Amino acid sequence: MCLLHISLPYLSCALLPGWYFDARPAASIVMFAAAEENDDPYPGKSGYNDTCELMDMDGAVASFDEGMLSAIESVYSIPTKKRLALPPPKAASPGALYQRLQGELGFPEGQTLLSAMEKWNEDMFSALPGHVDLYTEIALLSTSVDEVVRAGLDSLPTPSHYSPEVDLNAHGDEPFPEVPALEDDLEIYVISAQRFYLSELRTREEHYARLLRGYCVALLHYLYGSAKRQLRGSGSDASLMHKFKQVVRDRYYREAANLARLLYLHLYVSVTREVSWRLHASQVINQGVFVSLHYFWAQRRKFECLFHPVLFNHGVVILENDPLEFHDLQRINYRRRELGLPLIRAGLIEEENSPLEAEPLFSGKLPRTIGFLTHQIRTKMEAYSDAHPATPLFPLAEHSYSKRIGGRLSYGTTTEAMMDPPSPSAVLPGDPVPPLTVGVRQTAATLAIPSNLTLQSMETDGLDYSSMTGDELNQMFDI
């Protein structure tokens, strides 16, 4: 067995509310060449003739439903154009700011998806990078009420524009990967696809962080006016500051978290849609090369993650050391359809006359998808205070994205924070993400072929085609 180790900055992980472990973003990708011996592993619907020993690769990929080539794919077939954000919002009620943000993002389904995720169990977010470094200097997100109040007063009056500008369709520097013609180049392709996605996500989040700050400023200015109105013009400056701090403590953190939840759900879903449909458009017409790819998800959360660099896993697919089962594929495809993402295809395990999707069952005893998203957001919004340890720790128990302090729960703590881990050996979102491992079937480029070996010499030695499996024949003709 030939091993090739390639460094890969794979998706880092976040933590589930209430469970705290160190996240380790580094990972590697391991490519190995392994000869497979399968007698017609794609029977029936997948396009292979049961009476023919030679695998018909073109027929196999042609049989896959191309109904996924839809209007959605055509929209994302090219990079999205620059789309500048509206001017920073002025002071307005939390409800008005929420509606404005939803309209500015063009995300009418946002609240519906957030509500639906209350009844989902899939971990779609903990394998995504947190990018907490983007938030370490945003004092408006401090867990200290005093610091938030000072930052809010310093931001008066409301700026007329963002500086630098906020582009809601900002793109990264990585080039879009093209599907290789040869399976020998698959490992490079998988690395490139992931790098492209991570670059797009990172760049877009830089702009979204500035957008969040603009909405937090507007929210604070509204709360400042609310404090003034409650005093009705009476009282000293000290009374006004006391009232303002009380209003911030009671309302700011909760409302800021609501805005952030909508904003970052849109970030993750929109970037993943764009990249995934572009990948789908290029992969769907080149599916044959992926028959040689062996894909391994060491943890279920990596399989449930929003982003998949390969959408046509027609080779061997392994989930947590066992062959991927069709019902698992159906369930994750059901969620992907709800999110507007292309389905994952896997020719070896798909069953004839069976739908590609099946609704997953929900368990109230397991963590919820909204909890994974909420904690991903918490890691960002707590970054300022984590980076400035002089900040008092006690306000952590006062706001809606707080951690557990001495076992106490804040009013905004999610259900997940009150739950014990599913089992002592369960993989938690804060655990290190293991390396992504994919394998490539041996080809002419990876096999050590004797220089004097020819097809004629093999026939002279008594080669019998009728006794060879289709995969063996494919390898021989590759040679």
Curated annotation (Swiss-Prot):
A GO term for molecular function: DNA binding
One cellular component (GO) term of this entry: viral tegument
Coiled coil regions in record: none
Record-annotated disulphide pairs: none
Keyword Kinase listed: no
Keywords carried by this UniProt record: DNA-binding, Host nucleus, Host-virus interaction, Phosphoprotein, Transcription, Transcription regulation, Virion, Virion tegument
Biological process (GO), any one: regulation of DNA-templated transcription
Location in the cell: Virion tegument; Host nucleus
Role noted for this protein: Transcriptional activator of immediate-early (IE) gene products (alpha genes). Acts as a key activator of lytic infection by initiating the lytic program through the assembly of the transcriptional regulatory VP16-induced complex composed of VP16 and two cellular factors, HCFC1 and POU2F1. VP16-induced complex represents a regulatory switch: when it is on, it promotes IE-gene expression and thus lytic infection, and when it is off, it limits IE-gene transcription favoring latent infection.
Protein family membership: Belongs to the herpesviridae tegument protein VP16 protein family.
Assembly: Associates with the VP16-induced complex; binding to host HCFC1 activates VP16 for association with the octamer motif-binding host protein POU2F1, to form a multiprotein-DNA complex responsible for activating transcription of the viral immediate early genes.
Protein name (Swiss-Prot/TrEMBL): Tegument protein VP16 homolog
Species this protein is from: Equine herpesvirus 1 (strain Ab4p) (EHV-1)
